[in-house]
Amino acid sequence: MIEKTGNILDSSADALVNPVNCVGVSGAGLAKAIAQRYPRWAAAYKAAARRGDIRIGYVWRHAADVAFDAPLIYALPTKRHWREPSRLEDVAAGLEALAVDVCHSEFPPTSLALPAVGCGLGSLPWGQVRPLIEAAAEKMDRSGVTVYLYPPGAL
């Protein structure tokens, strides 16, 4: 795991993690920034939420856009509803699901940009979330995926 600073959207990683809610709203924070940059991804995420495909303890992955250089984006639900704070157990379940999906994918990304999921608008303390991220990143690192961690404040 390599700690980074700056805007996660400027990362050169093949894939990035978007902390989302289960109702399909991308109204603030990184989710909003991703929705603005990749409107096709945002529309697909919203449709997936309406279908019930966005659930705590699962990740949903989808290409950001049809452009060749667009990243794969993993939606990692950290909130059941956008009005609620994140729950540590939900973030833990999501990170475990992310590690399993990345490690067992037929075509895994070679690199993954991972923000401080659940910490910003989710209101969880970084000191509690960081060990969960480190554990998931270690599993992905062992599978050959370089994880770039963007701590709180990176965007």
Short names for language-model regions:
Residues 1-155:
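Macrodomain-like recognition of ADP-ribose-binding/processing modules
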